[in-house]
């Protein structure tokens, strides 16, 4: 009996941690949307917040288990991590710009097509094979099609309102800033940019898989990766905003709060992610990703006074179904591999989420 209670408590801790992690990530997107309306520029935001996150994660290097021997950090590995950092920078920049044009709900919905995009790229690069004789392969193809159809519906079909937001004044950030809703043209631009973001994420996952095979130390790779994002976004910001140096001065208002909160939550989220993946299969973490759509809808309604449109609802459902079908196909494929090649170690591609980018 005591063992069963202990098991339930353990599962409850995992469940709470994952829900808190997804909620915090969507919350950061909502907070960023508000802060940009108060003058926060994306480049100092990313530069400062990721620098803070890397500094907060640095002590973890002294507590991680280094019992296994690792290859030295060669120039080849460092260059690949640098490339991963560049791709990550493109990912967070396009993600931030996409949210500025649209809202966190669209960002969460489009974010769930990443497994489908990763599968497409893996087939193109011949890292995955499509065989319609295998259920797992059929599932991944069907899930990819569902996800892409859902993405097109979310972006191109607004539809009528199915829920009109009405939030209390003390929770409504629109009292503090200009209107945060997006026009139809901005929505389309935001959707296109967020789709490009998904492509960057998918390419990053493929590169990340190769890096982790050569240097399987997640904390070290992640800290260097996050630090690279801070450096690259700073360099891009200095070039793009060279005539506007005042953006690098942060005031003691919601902009500073957003940067500090993002840095802290990014580091904490990674710790939760690494802890969960150490005790659970990567599929367990993936199961919670579609919940970000629901969380974004709730937060957008409460804090941004966003309304829910039929297109977003239908597209979100299709994307969620496609997501789970792709993940089922990948899980079934990995299960078959383990049964057939029990003596070999395989690194999952779509299920590998050791450095889930933020």
From Swiss-Prot:
Signal sequence interval, chain numbering:
none
The source's domain of life comes to: Eukaryota
Coiled-coil blocks: none
Q: Name one GO molecular function term.
A: transmembrane transporter activity
Transmembrane portions of the chain: 12-32, 42-62, 81-101, 105-125, 137-157, 187-207, 219-239, 245-265, 283-303, 308-328
Predominant localisation class: membrane
> Which cysteines are cross-linked by disulfides?
none
Q: Which residues form the EamA domain?
A: 27-155
Q: Which GO terms describe its cellular component?
A: membrane
Q: How does it sit in the membrane?
A: Multi-pass membrane protein
Q: Where does the UniProt annotation locate this protein?
A: Membrane
Q: Which of UniProt's keywords are assigned here?
A: Membrane, Transmembrane, Transmembrane helix
By sequence similarity, the record places it as follows: Belongs to the drug/metabolite transporter (DMT) superfamily. Plant drug/metabolite exporter (P-DME) (TC 2.A.7.4) family.
* Protein name as annotated: WAT1-related protein At3g28080
| Organism for this UniProt entry | Arabidopsis thaliana
